[in-house]
Amino acid sequence: MDYTFNRKFGIEIEAYNCSRERLARELRESGIEVVVEGYNHTTRPHWKLVTDSSLNGNDTFELVSPILVGEAGLRELEKVCWVLELCDVKVNGSCGLHVHIDAAGFSMETWRNLALSYKHLEPVIDRFMPASRRDNYYCRGLGHVSDGMIRSARTVDELKGRIGDRYHKVNLEAYSRHKTVEFRQHSGTTNFTKMRNWVLFLHKLVTFATRGQVPAATALQDIPFLDSEQKLYYKLRTKKLSA
């Protein structure tokens, strides 16, 4: 299977400790087009800095990307992370990192495979995420949906109804709004290596779902779409979080 990364994606970074005005200025000085806006769900051709009432801390914000594409998109994201570091941006347990993956061409089979695969991998993914992201009101799991209920869903709307509202680890409501699928589980971070690995993990998961599903009780070492480097990365993340 070809896992070359040329897919469209988007990212939402929740964080605090830098005023939106200062962050916007530093981003612009680094060649990143950004606008400070009120809370909204509109996809823009630029980065946007919006407020988010669910966050705790001083100078909280959500930085939302435009549509990014493949490796070039990751390079732009890396520049943004350099600026976040410059501005001493911080995260805490109230912050998440949300990733949107383009879902415009998905068949129903792909949607079912994706939901089943994430559900089957949830115990593994939970172990390389902090406890605050395991059963959080804003990113609830898929354990309440039986495999049979996922398999018998005939439309995206039906599948969405069975999973529930947008506050789940896999959010299907994003499809009607943006023609994407949103993954909400990752903890807040300003670390590019973490972001890159998670975006690529999701890209590969989605690519794999176009052909099949990951079986229940699959161990990290047996995830069919990960290469040895990513398996090692997440093995070490798991080890660190269990220490």
For the regions a protein language model found, what residue spans apply to each?
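C-terminal accessory/tail domains of diverse enzymes
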Residues: 1-90, 104-243
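C-terminal substrate-recognition regions of SAM-dependent nucleic acid methyltransferases
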Residues: 96
